[in-house]
Amino acid sequence: MKTFVIGDIHGCYTALLAVVDAAGITPEDCLITLGDYIDRGPEVRQVVEWLLDWQQTGQLIPLLGNHELMMQASRKDTQSYQFWLACGGEDTLRAYTPENEEMCLDYFPEEHWKFIENDCHQWHETATHIFVHASLHPGLPLERQYEQVLFWDRCLLHPPHHSGKIMICGHTPQAEGIPANYGHAICLDTGVYLEGGWLTCLDVASGKYWQANQSGDTRSCQLGDPRPS
C-alpha cells in the first residue's frame, strides 16, 4: 500500500480524475487530501461526490481547508456569507443550484454538509510526516494548534515543527505550478484553478509527483528536480 497526497482541488474534477489515473492510485492505497475542495473551479459538486465515493474504500483521509471553513461560517451570518462569496463561494453555489433558480446554500445536500463537518480532519500525523492545510505553529502539539495557523497562515511563516516531522501542506499557490520542497515543509498547492495551474499528487515515500490540469494534460517529476515533463 502506498500513501498519496493531493493538494488543493478547488472544484477541478477533470484534473482530479486525470491525476489519480496518472499516479495509478488504487482503492488499496492511502489517499490524503489537503482540503479546499470547493470554490473557484467549475466542478465542485463532482469533486465532493467523488470524495464521498472514494471514502467507501476506507482509505481516504480528507482534511479541512479554509474554504470549507468559510462556507460553514457563511450559514451563521450575512457578513460571513458575503466574505465567502467574495473568495470563490459563487462558484460553489453555481455548481449546486438548478438552472434558472436563485443561487443559495439550500441546494447543498445534507450528505455533503456531513462530509465537510463530520468527516474532514484538521490534520493527520504519521511516524514521519504531518499533513495539514496551511501551516503549523512550531512549538505547539497538534491538539493545541491555532485555527489561524492551521488554515490561514502561509507555509514558510514558521520554522520547522518541534516534532522534527516534515509538514506537507497546501493553501499557498506555488509559482509556475511547481510544488515547493523546503526540507521541513512541502507545499502541494499548485493553483489548478488558475491559468497555467496544475493539480499535484505526491507519492510520499518516493517523492515522485504527478500533475494534471483542467485540459486533462498530465506530467510528472521528482521533488527537487527542476521541472516536470
Regions found by a protein language model. Give the residues of each.
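N-terminal active-site segment of His-dependent metallophosphoesterases
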Residues: M1-W50
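Conserved beta-sheet core of the metallophosphoesterase superfamily
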Residues: L140, Y146-N213
